Amino acid sequence: MRRLPIVLLLSVFSIANCAKVDVDLINETIRDLLHFKSSDPNVTSFHRSSHTLTEHMKNLYENFIDEDSNEDGNLVRAIEPAVGKFEGQEVLVFDVEGFDSHESIMRAELHFYLRRRDSFARRRSRQIRAKSVCVNEYCRQQTLKKIRVGGDENLEEYKVIWDATKSVFDSYHLDAKQAVFRITREHSKMRPYAEMIRKSTPFLVIYSKVNHTLDTVSVMKQTEQTKRKRRDLGNEELREYYNYNSIPLDNDDREPIKRKNGKKNSLSEEISSEDVWQGFGEETSREERERIANEELANDVRVVLLQNKNRCHKEGVLVSLKHFGWDRYVIEPKTIETSFCKGKCAKPMLTSGKASNHAMLQSLFAAEPVCCAPTNLKSLNFWYRDEKGRTVIRNYSKMLIGSCSCL
C-alpha cells in the first residue's frame, strides 16, 4: 500500500514524540521538496523577475491554494528569455534544462505584452506572429497558434498568448537544453529583442505532471553525507541537534484574534526556554473558550482548542523557511507545517463531537478504541525560484492535515 506524502514528511521530522532534529536534516528535506541539487540557500542570488511574470504566477499560486490542485498539472514553471542569434536573426532563448525525470509536459504558453495601450493596440496584437526555431536536426519549425485570452476581453488588445506545447514537448523529449522562438510583426520590423524583452516582457509558462513524493531515503542519505563532510573538515559543532516537543499549533507572534464583540483573545506566554522553535514555532495553553469562539476558530490551521488536553486534536510545529535561509528562494509559503493527529476518543462517543458514524458505532461495540485521525488532507504548495532562477510552483497533494477527528 502506497504511503501518503504526509506520512513521509512526518517520518523525516519524527515529531510524534520528543524529537531530535538538526539543521542539516531540515535543510535536506526542504531541498528535496524543491528538487534542488546542490545550491546553498545562503549564497545564490537572482535578478528580479518582471512584474507581469510575477503577477501571473501569483494568480496561479492563489488558484492552487483555492482549488487545492490544478487540472493542468502539479508543476508550473515560468521562464524568462535571453537573446540569441540563429542564422543571423535574433531569437528568444528559454532555458529548459534540468527538468524532472519522467516529467509529463501537459501544456506550454508563450506570453507577450504590448506596451502601448492605444486605439491601435488590437490591430498590432493581430499582426504579431511567433514560431519555434528548430536547433535540432530531428525537430521541425512550427508556427504557433494564438490562444484566446480568458477573462477580460480588453486583455486581447495588449496581451498575446501562443500555444507552445508541441515545441516544448519536442525539446524535452529530444533532450534539448533550450526552447527557441522568433517573434515577428506583419509589414513591420520588430524592435531589437533586448528592447522587446524590456518593454513587452515575453515569458514561457510550462505546465507539467510529476510524481511528487518525498524521498525519505535520499533525504537521510544526503544528511549523513553532509555530516560526514563537516566531520572531515573538523566542524562537527557548527550544527547542533535540537530537542523539542511537539506542540499544539497556534501563533504567538501574530496579532490577537478579535471576536465579534470586539474583545481580544490573549495569547499564551508559556513557552519553554529550551524550545528551539521559540519565535517561529507556536505553542498555546488557553482556557476553555466560549462555544461561539470555538466554532469560529475550529478550522483555523494554527489554532487547537484545548477544552480537554487529551481530546483528539492537531499538533505539530511550523518550520520557518527564513530561519534556515530558504527565503532567498521561496516566495511562499513562509513556513512549513509538520502536523499530526493526537489525543483520545471517548467511549462511548458523544454526539457533540465531530466523530464519524463509524466511530460512534465502534465506540459502543468494538474492543479496539476509536482512532484520532485526519478528516481531510490538504496540499502543500511552493512558489519559488529554482537553481536557475526560473519561477516555479510545485503542488504536493495530501501533505498537510486540514483537521483531526475520531474516525
UniProtKB/Swiss-Prot annotation:
PROSITE patterns with a match to the protein in the record: TGF_BETA_2 (PS51362)
A GO term, aspect molecular function: growth factor activity
CDD domains to which the protein is assigned, alphabetical: TGF_beta_BMPs_GDFs
One Pfam family recorded for the sequence: TGF_beta
Cited Gene3D superfamilies: Cystine-knot cytokines
Keywords: Glycoprotein, Growth factor, Neurogenesis, Secreted, Signal
Residues that carry a glycan: N27, N42, N211, N395
GO cellular component: extracellular region; extracellular space
Region entry Disordered, spans: 252-283
InterPro entries: Cystine-knot_cytokine, TGF-b_C, TGF-beta-rel
Subcellular location: Secreted, Extracellular space
Record keyword Signal present: yes
Signal sequence interval, chain numbering: 1-18
BP GO annotations: backward locomotion; dorsal/ventral axon guidance; inductive cell migration; locomotion; motor neuron axon guidance; nematode male tail tip morphogenesis
The protein's role, per its UniProt record: Required for the migration of axonal growth-cones and distal tip cells (DTC) along the dorsal-ventral axis of the body wall. Acts cell nonautonomously and independently of the classical daf-4, sma-6 or daf-1 TGFbeta receptor signaling. During axon migration, facilitates long-range repulsive guidance of unc-6/netrin by enhancing unc-5-unc-40 signaling at the expense of unc-5 alone signaling, probably through direct interaction with receptor unc-5. Involved in cell-cell contact formation in sensory rays in the developing male tail, via a pathway involving plx-2 and mab-20/semaphorin-2A.
Oligomeric form and interacting partners: Interacts with netrin receptor unc-5; the interaction is direct.
Family stated for the protein in its record: Belongs to the TGF-beta family.
Entry protein name: BMP-like protein unc-129
Organism in which the protein naturally occurs: Caenorhabditis elegans
Gene transcribed to yield this protein: unc-129
